[in-house]
Design a protein with these regions (language model features):
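Conserved alpha-helix/loop element of class I SAM-dependent methyltransferases that forms part
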Residues: 30-50
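A short acidic, Gly/Pro-enriched loop at the edge of an enzyme's catalytic core
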Residues: 129-141
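Conserved class I S-adenosyl-L-methionine
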Residues: 49-58, 74
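Conserved Class I S-adenosyl-L-methionine
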Residues: 182-211
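A short glycine-rich, Lys/Arg-flanked "PGG" loop and its adjoining helix->strand segment in the class I
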Residues: 154-166
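S-adenosyl-L-methionine
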Residues: 91-129
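Conserved beta-strand signature within the Rossmann-like core of class I S-adenosyl-L-methionine
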Residues: 168-175
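Conserved SAM/SAH-binding beta-strand->alpha-helix loop
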Residues: 79
Length: 236
């Protein structure tokens, strides 16, 4: 079974995307600058408007954030469970259970922030390495924490020149956690920034890089603290 179809990962990602600081990290200490990562992927990297694509959208928070300034946003993820949750959040709040300890849980509510025009966003199940031919072109493409979960990263990158309009923005964020569970070793881009530069050099200019910390809570006393590298590219 794909772990991204499991109840455990669905609940973790709903908390990661929509949980409050207190719901995720109820301690006085801890890496608070790592919270709100799906929103920061947009707010700290993009001056976005027009039509946007969120590849690997998970349960949708970044796609909704893009809708603050973009008139149309398409979110695509390979996980059917994630897309079902994102679509449910277009029209209603979504209850879920946060893992605390063992089988002890706390009921929480995932809620899209106020002020977002949710009708601008659509979600669909899809493969980032094999997108439908009629998806069109975009002013903004976001790929957050996706590249190291693809079996053929270069296949996905090769499609990007056809997806981003000239002058459009591409943002790729990733902690580059290469695992053979997802990507055959021969397909790892190591070092990743060099691999991205080589793959995108003919069509994109790299305009900035920055470090973006993020925090995923597994249970009350176990967290994944990671640092993604965000690269911003402009289509020639």
């Amino acid at each position: 079974m794909n772990i991204y179809e499991s109840d455990k990962l669905l609940a973790e990602y709903l908390l990661f995307h929509y949980g409050s600081a207190e719901e995720i990290l109820p301690y006085e200490f801890g890496p608070r600058k790592a919270l709100e990562y799906p929103a920061r992927c947009v707010s700290e990297n993009l001056t976005a408007s027009g039509r946007a694509l969120d590849l690997g959208c998970a349960v949708g928070r970044s796609a909704f954030e893009l809708a603050r300034t973009c008139f149309e946003v398409i979110g695509i993820d390979f996980s059917r469970r994630f897309i079902e949750a994102a679509n449910a959040l277009k029209t209603a709040d979504l209850p879920y259970l946060r893992a605390d300890e063992g089988d002890r849980t706390t009921p929480l509510i995932a809620r899209v922030p106020a002020g977002i025009e949710r009708t601008r966003v659509s979600f669909e199940v899809g493969d980032a390495m094999n997108l439908r031919a009629d998806i069109g072109v975009f002013d903004v493409v976001l790929m957050a924490n996706l590249i190291d979960r693809l079996s053929e990263p270069l296949r996905c990158l090769a499609r990007l020149p056809d997806l981003v309009k000239p002058g459009g923005q591409l943002v790729i964020t990733s902690p580059y956690t290469w695992l053979e569970d997802f990507t055959p070793r021969a397909n790892w881009l190591c070092p990743a920034l060099d691999g991205l530069r080589t793959a995108l050099a003919l069509d994109f200019d790299l305009v900035s890089t920055r470090d973006l910390p993020f925090l995923i809570r597994e249970h009350a006393r176990k967290f994944q603290w990671s640092v993604a590298q965000a690269t911003v590219w402009i289509r020639r």
